Regions:
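Conserved active-site tyrosine of GNAT-family acetyltransferases
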Residues: 148-154
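Conserved catalytic-core motifs of GNAT/GCN5-like acyltransferases
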Residues: 155-166
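Short, high-confidence coil segments that cap the C-terminus of an alpha-helix
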Residues: 54, 130-133
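A short helix-loop-beta-strand connector motif used in the catalytic cores of GNAT acetyltransferases and
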Residues: 46-58, 67, 74-78
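Conserved acetyl-CoA-binding loop-helix of GNAT-fold acetyltransferases
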Residues: 108-126
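Conserved beta-strand-loop-alpha-helix junction that forms the acyl-donor binding cleft
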Residues: 136-147, 165
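Short amphipathic alpha-helix that is part of the acyltransferase structural core
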Residues: 2-47
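Conserved acyl-donor/pantetheine-binding loop and adjacent beta-alpha core of acyl/acetyltransferases
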Residues: 65-103, 108-111
Length: 166
């Protein structure tokens, strides 16, 4: 169960939140400039083909640059293995989050990282409802991130893949 203080803090963040579209080059520049670790250990030219088909955004909370996010508006998640879907048909219209990272400085200015991430996912839940998506899917690079996702309502399905059912 989520703490009331976390719910209230994330609600306040969500109300100030907006995404600003950025190009792939701008995304790489921000990753380098702010020391984001999302692509650590990955050969940018060979190992991230999904990066080039993903929409990227700056996460803004008011006028504070909070982080970056990349997602696809449509992703047929379990097309190769429909038995992996948590519910029949769930993978047909899912929002796939390819990358998400919150700036350390934003945590100091805005609030706890968990509240910021929950605010981002609450914002995306509204987006999904408006656009007919059935779930949000994302991967967790580390167990620490996986634990944060579990705290805000994501369910682990396999390995480091998580889903949030709408």
């Amino acid at each position: 169960m989520l703490q009331l203080s976390l719910i209230l803090e994330s609600f306040e963040i969500k109300n100030k939140l907006h995404f600003e579209p950025i190009s792939q080059d701008e995304t790489f520049n921000l990753i380098d400039k702010y020391g984001f670790t999302i692509l650590d250990g990955i050969d940018r030219l060979k190992e991230i083909p999904d990066f080039y088909t993903t929409n990227h955004y700056k996460i803004m909370v008011g006028d504070v640059f909070a982080g970056i996010i990349g997602f696809n508006n449509y992703y047929d998640t379990w097309k190769d293995d429909p038995y992996m879907a948590p519910e029949p048909g769930l993978g047909k219209h899912s929002l796939w989050i390819q990358m998400l990272e919150i700036r350390k400085e934003a945590r100091e200015k805005i609030g706890s990282p968990l509240a910021i991430i929950k605010g981002v996912f609450d914002y995306l839940c509204d987006y999904c409802k408006e656009n007919g998506f059935k779930s949000i899917l994302c991967g967790a690079k580390t167990e620490r991130i996986a634990t944060m996702y579990r705290h805000i309502g994501f369910i682990g399905k396999k390995d480091s893949m998580f889903y949030l059912i709408k």
